[in-house]
């Protein structure tokens, strides 16, 4: 979450020469980072981390695994919708202090769009979906990608399921001490 009254132009200016950030391909050395050396990819990853920490933002993550729902997408959708709705209710006074909540989502997963719209629609909050969001156009969208990746790495670490490419990119000590700890400091408390 970012209050648009908090100017972040100077923060963005510091990383203006960096490419569009997408954490997974940076870690796995996939396009467009496939020809980049590890040290250069780590530099970009570290820069988006520092950028994230410098921002006046708050985050909250929801994490689910399909297998926990026996691959029943309707049950999963119901659970996620309920959790998002409860989050909105728990934080209603804070969220309602804004004239409007703008949701930046690229419609990458239709189910997520339905869940967000459903939960917000019954919450009583004034909201709008930003139309035609292109991830490369919004650094905050890229920050959300970074945060999601770190949260996923945190889950994989807790289950001892980090891949070889992830372990090669960032060791467990720095993952916990720097990235997970730093991202968790940005968490909006319920």
Question: Which functions belong to the PLM regions below?
Answer:
Residues 1-190:
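Phosphate-ester processing/binding pockets and catalytic centers
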């Amino acid at each position: 979450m970012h209050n648009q009254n908090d100017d972040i132009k100077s923060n963005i200016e510091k990383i203006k020469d960096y490419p569009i950030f997408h954490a997974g391909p940076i870690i796995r050395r996939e396009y467009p980072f496939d020809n980049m050396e590890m040290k250069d990819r780590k530099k970009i990853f570290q820069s988006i981390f520092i950028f994230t920490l410098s921002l006046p933002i708050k985050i909250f993550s929801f994490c689910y695994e399909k297998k926990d729902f026996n691959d029943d997408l309707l049950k999963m959708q119901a659970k996620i919708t309920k959790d998002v709705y409860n989050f909105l209710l728990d934080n209603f006074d804070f969220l309602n202090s804004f004239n409007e909540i703008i949701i930046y989502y690229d419609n990458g997963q239709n189910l997520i769009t339905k869940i967000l719209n459903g939960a917000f629609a019954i919450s009583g909050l004034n909201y709008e979906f930003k139309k035609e969001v292109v991830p490369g156009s919004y650094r905050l969208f890229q920050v959300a990608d970074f945060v999601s990746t770190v949260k996923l790495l945190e889950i994989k670490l807790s289950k001892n399921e980090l891949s070889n490419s992830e372990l090669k990119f960032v060791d467990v000590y720095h993952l916990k001490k720097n990235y997970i700890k730093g991202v968790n400091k940005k968490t909006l408390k319920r």
